[in-house]
Amino acid sequence: MERAVQGTDGGGGSNSSSRSSSRATSAGSSPSCSLAGRGVSSRSAAAGLGGGGSRSSPGSVAASPSGGGGRRREPALEGVLSKYTNLLQGWQNRYFVLDFEAGILQYFVNEQSKHQKPRGVLSLSGAIVSLSDEAPHMLVVYSANGEMFKLRAADAKEKQFWVTQLRACAKYHMEMNSKSAPSSRSRSLTLLPHGTPNSASPCSQRHLSVGAPGVVTITHHKSPAAARRAKSQYSGQLHEVREMMNQVEGQQKNLVHAIESLPGSGPLTALDQDLLLLKATSAATLSCLGECLNLLQQSVHQAGQPSQKPGASENILGWHGSKSHSTEQLKNGTLGSLPSASANITWAILPNSAEDEQTSQPEPEPNSGSELVLSEDEKSDNEDKEETELGVMEDQRSIILHLISQLKLGMDLTKVVLPTFILEKRSLLEMYADFMAHPDLLLAITAGATPEERVICFVEYYLTAFHEGRKGALAKKPYNPIIGETFHCSWEVPKDRVKPKRTASRSPASCHEHPMADDPSKSYKLRFVAEQVSHHPPISCFYCECEEKRLCVNTHVWTKSKFMGMSVGVSMIGEGVLRLLEHGEEYVFTLPSAYARSILTIPWVELGGKVSINCAKTGYSATVIFHTKPFYGGKVHRVTAEVKHNPTNTIVCKAHGEWNGTLEFTYNNGETKVIDTTTLPVYPKKIRPLEKQGPMESRNLWREVTRYLRLGDIDAATEQKRHLEEKQRVEERKRENLRTPWKPKYFIQEGDGWVYFNPLWKAH
């Protein structure tokens, strides 16, 4: 069949980019046009390009009927992209060809070698194409068999074009494979070995020899009687395939059992990296084969009964993938302890719950603020504040590898129970309280003389709040709060430390805790309460108020974690509202995302994303951007901010620096101010002793887990955590049987948000 090419830029134009732009060679419509119309169906090879051919911008290929039958044909997308090869060679330019009809992405060393054997081929059926912030204009293509291409385009436009075409191709072939239906004319579905070119026409495919090696042809016949005969014939063959797969499944189970029966120490253990990879690969292979068998069964069934939908008949064989030890227990939400030299770590994917099987306790008491007013019982917090700055130990790395082998890219980790050794010795609710470690800056907001000064004070406080809440650079995960869990504390701030921004004269201070005032009458009291109000989704609420300064903060946060390969991302969905009752102002703010990087070596944390601060009454707003570190070069923990007066479109303040280091503020009058977060005074929380805390207060609830983590006894900590989880499951089942809805103790749902039951703005 004739293949023709049509250029669109006069035949001799060139792309101004240093790297050649992606181009589509076509005898038909452009990729964008054709994909919008009817999806990908066939490929037009690049041919007849004199002197390298025309260089057209993406999507600019003209549409014209092909010679011969007038049938519109889809182009093959070609162009130069940078591919990440290895750690030593880094990024290298390679010539890529996207074959729409075959559904493959292949690359060559350069354009001249594209008629030779490709250097690499990636099947796009069922592939995932995602964007990445590791490098500029980067995209990652993950095939269904686990292979991966890390690619970079010349610019954002080219990147988006490639992403669009790759995703469309992947979607098209996935739909064709899973939703194939018999057409009105006879056609064949041919399964060829990997890499075999499928150039035969539909007619020639029907006459392929049955004995041809490596070729299996399933023919959809026009005659219903012939279709029924073929169905009976192939159904019997599929029965044989199913029996064979059942045998392989049993062998794979034996393999997994043999691996997991190995001793916990010695030259070969159950956590050997090669054995973990073997387990994961064998399970994934069986799963893929099972999907293929299901597709074949649907095709045979549809050939005989074209009017019925796939799966409508009970005669279709059922095989749902490998039921290996690991896979089966993952689905059931249970997995036995993994042998380890120093720890028995239990983790499981839970059906409808967050990390610690967030479940309910018996119905709480009616809303009551009694625990907030018992401030005479509170004492200065003397808990250890720093996590041990150690990397991942070898046996722990093996456990994490085992965990990663069971996860999929983009998987929601709120449904995964993580190993105990990665947990931080505090609850997420307490971590929110630690964001208030500089209460003097918070209370100074209301002391501002003008709306401009107050919004700038809030931005200063906001940017300095995160470093203490993170407790060092080591990325560890706080306990996921259990529904009904609460945390209470307070701060005493000397009144002479709370001053407006322009008049505040801060002498150099150490980063040690700031001493409390001896006379309570000379201090402001800042109270804090947090509660876990929901477990699906996991929503935490916290409320903070200073009655004397008539200031309060009400916040609700939904944490959503996601697996990103060698890192974990946590989105903080929700918002907070700072109310200055003295001025009648409300500042609505959002929170950044957090990322745990290098989870297999020395994990570290960074913040990322764009957040906003808005005050509708005054017209002031602020935009804060937490910059994540680029793949190559760049600084970590960088943040920039801009405060704007919207009615006049005037920028009144800019800030830049590091959220856990030095921040520099520049005001519109030319003044500058530098804040070093490492030298800011830290005010310790005041918290009641454990013996005076309720059973659902964070430290009392997790006390045994925390104690064993401090002792380094991971086995005992895991056992205590498991005991706590099981207790919550029992209470949850009771609540479900009684159909009793959970009623939070301190917060009330209003619309999509949650509000403290007795806030300062309602009491005054």
Swiss-Prot record:
BP-aspect Gene Ontology terms: phosphatidylserine acyl-chain remodeling
GO cellular component, one term: cytoskeleton
PH domain ranges (all copies): 74-171
SMART domains named among the record's database cross-references: PH
Modified residues (Phosphoserine): S29, S30, S57, S60, S64, S201, S209, S223
Residue spans of biased composition, Acidic residues class: 374-389
Ligand binding (a 1,2-diacyl-sn-glycero-3-phospho-(1D-myo-inositol 4-phosphate)): 413-418, 477-480, 535-536, 721, 725, 729
Subcellular location: Cytoplasm, Cytoskeleton
Keyword check for Transit peptide: no
InterPro entries: OSBP_sf, Oxysterol-bd, Oxysterol-bd_CS, PH-like_dom_sf, PH_8, PH_domain
Comp. bias regions, Low complexity: 15-47, 55-65
Omega-N-methylarginine modifications at: R38
A Pfam family the protein falls into: Oxysterol_BP
Keyword annotations: Coiled coil, Cytoplasm, Cytoskeleton, Lipid biosynthesis, Lipid metabolism, Lipid transport, Lipid-binding, Methylation, Phosphoprotein, Transport
Residues binding a 1,2-diacyl-sn-glycero-3-phospho-L-serine: L413, T414, K415, V416, V417, L418, N480, S561
Free-text note on domains in this protein's UniProt record: The C-terminal region binds cholesterol, 25-hydroxysterol and acidic phospholipids and is required for localization to microtubules.
Stored PANTHER family: OXYSTEROL-BINDING PROTEIN-RELATED (PTHR10972), OXYSTEROL-BINDING PROTEIN-RELATED PROTEIN 10 (PTHR10972:SF47)
Role noted for this protein: Probable lipid transporter involved in lipid countertransport between the endoplasmic reticulum and the plasma membrane. Its ability to bind phosphatidylserine, suggests that it specifically exchanges phosphatidylserine with phosphatidylinositol 4-phosphate (PI4P), delivering phosphatidylserine to the plasma membrane in exchange for PI4P. Plays a role in negative regulation of lipid biosynthesis. Negatively regulates APOB secretion from hepatocytes. Binds cholesterol and acidic phospholipids. Also binds 25-hydroxycholesterol. Binds phosphatidylserine.
Family to which the UniProt record says this protein belongs: Belongs to the OSBP family.
Protein name: Oxysterol-binding protein-related protein 10
Organism: Homo sapiens
